[in-house]
């Protein structure tokens, strides 16, 4: 799978042009409020633009609402997304050579929370085609445990909160998944069977069932227990598993905080799962604060059970340094070694351990001085 080159200029914290190469699997990690979510939002704006474009739009002028419920985006208005230091007042994006941008001049003909994207007719068709193989975005605020799920208008894919996962699962449970997404073939390749296998891999002893209780209602069951007996971790993870197993080859899966409510081993195994989906031809993009997610991905690639190469993973580490945004691209070699370990890149355990050692050493020295 070829990399997608994303460039951002003038959007939020991106005062100057910044480039990102979206690999088979790409991870955004690092400090809070350093730009990770803004990169994801740039992709969502591209997707929304591709959905809004229609053939009779003249001159490629596309009004886009910055308050988008489908993708759980509440960006405010133009003044909230423009970088105040940009000289032109424009916000420029490019995705795989497809340029789409927001002009800086005020337009009184559009609503307060709406901006106007400009894109040429040729580029608008390319943008449509770019997302034609499937697109799923799972935001950090996924569903909480509850008994039943209501059928959604977007019932062929999980919505951004995963609230319709029961319906999506029910729709595809008898379908075959792509073989390389199977954990193993002992139970066959049907979605229901493979979801059982992956659930048991991440949450030993857990199996998932969906029971239809009405024309638009489904009840989620885990083994023989009704859904509220299931913890947050499984509930948060289920939309990721179903989406990964059902999205078409060549599609894009964006997941925020896949580690939410999972213990360390489950986080690592979730990373392993996402890497397996990437190896099967899904472009996976992850925003995470978990070193266990990263290490699970590294483990899957190094094991060599798929054709996925170490060159198919890229990590972007975001930090605020001396009041400025700093982004470091980190790659991996064939042995799983990372190209860079900047300060604060998953080294908090080491920092805390050293702090404890120093504190205890100083305490002993003080006690000895008192004797």
How does the language model describe each region?
Residues 17-23, 245-249, 276-278:
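Phosphate-binding P-loop
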Residues 5-7, 49-243, 248-249, 321, ...:
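Phosphate-coordinating catalytic segments in nucleotide- and nucleic-acid-processing enzymes
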Residues 255-258:
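Walker B catalytic motif
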Residues 1-49:
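Pre-Walker A-like glycine/lysine-rich segment at the N-terminus of P-loop NTPase domains
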Residues 11-13, 27, 33-34, 142-145, ...:
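Short, solvent-exposed loop/turn segments at secondary-structure junctions
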Residues 2, 269-371:
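C-terminal lobe/lid and adjacent interdomain/linker elements of RecA-like ASCE P-loop ATPase modules
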